[in-house]
Swiss-Prot record:
Up-regulation conditions: Negatively regulated by SHOOT MERISTEMLESS (STM).
Lineage top rank: taxon: Eukaryota
Keyword tags: Developmental protein, Nucleus, Repressor, Stress response
More info: Gain-of-function mutants iso1-D and iso-2D (T-DNA tagging) show completely curled up hyponastic rosette leaves.
Null allele phenotype: Plants are indistinguishable from that of wild-type at 16 degrees Celsius, however they generate a weak phenotype of pointed leaves at 22 degrees Celsius which become narrower at 26 degrees Celsius. In the leaves of plants grown at 26 degrees Celsius, the xylems are located on the adaxial sides and the phloems are on the abaxial sides, similar to those in the wild-type. Plants with double mutations in this protein and in RH10 or AS1 protein have abaxialized filamentous and trumpet-like leaves with loss of the adaxial domain at high temperatures.
Stated family: Belongs to the LOB domain-containing protein family.
Localization of this protein: Nucleus
Keyword Cell membrane on entry: no
Name of the protein in its database record: Protein ASYMMETRIC LEAVES 2
InterPro entries xref list: LOB
Annotated organism of origin: Arabidopsis thaliana
UniProt subunit comment: Homo- and heterodimer with AS1. Interacts with AS1. Part of the AS1 repressor complex composed of AS1, LBD6/AS2 and HDA6. Interacts with LFR.
GO CC entries: nucleoplasm; nucleus
GO BP annotations listed: adaxial/abaxial axis specification; petal development; polarity specification of adaxial/abaxial axis; proximal/distal pattern formation; specification of symmetry
């Protein structure tokens, strides 16, 4: 930024054809190499109005104010009817359109996420059903095996007089009765098959 110490007037003082004083309010914000910036501001707002505005502001706020005035002046010269309002309206319209597009994209994404969750649920359900069927088959086979392996006491000994209890002597006695029961049948079978000598 230019100052009076450079012996070169600021763009405002040069445009107004006056001597740039050390306390010039325009010097920090309108350097000599940006004459068009002040020309536009002066044409739209007037140098006196800008001077009054800057004097009422705190020095820390003046730079932002000058940049805003310069932008508004440039837009007003480009579009005398709407000025910067036309640009703001266009940007707002673009923002609304982008928000609509974003909402649609989120809706589509939610649909795909729901389909993914549903597919995963169906897959998990199918795996559980297969596992349940396999467990049921294994249980049926196990029950069938136990049914044929372990018979009731009455079915095993066929009504024989077997002493009650699980002692060893009772088991031996039962086996002896079965053996005695089978031997006469075998003998009778042998007699039935014996051939008679015709002589």
């Amino acid at each position: 930024m230019a100052s009076s110490s450079t012996n070169s007037p600021c763009a405002a003082c040069k445009f107004l054809r006056r001597k740039c004083q050390p306390e010039c309010v325009f010097a920090p914000y309108f350097p000599p190499d940006q004459p068009q910036k002040f020309a536009n501001v002066h044409k739209v707002f007037g140098a006196s109005n800008v001077t009054k505005l800057l004097n009422e502001l705190h020095p820390s706020q003046r730079e932002d104010a000058v940049n805003s005035l310069a932008y508004e002046a440039d837009m007003r010269l480009r579009d005398p009817v709407y000025g910067c309002v036309g640009v703001i309206s266009l940007l707002q319209h673009q923002l609304r359109q982008l928000q609509i597009d974003l909402s649609c994209a989120k809706s589509e994404l939610s649909k795909y996420q729901s389909l993914g969750i549903l597919a995963a649920t169906h897959q998990s359900l199918g795996i559980n059903l297969l596992a349940g069927a396999a467990d049921g088959t294994a249980t049926a086979v196990r029950d069938h095996y136990h049914h044929h392996q372990f018979f009731p006491r009455e079915q095993m000994f066929g009504g024989l007089d077997v002493p009650a209890g699980n002692n060893y002597d009772g088991g031996i006695l039962a086996i002896g009765q079965i053996t005695q029961f089978q031997q006469p049948r075998a003998a009778a079978g042998d007699d039935g098959r014996r051939t008679v000598d015709p002589s």
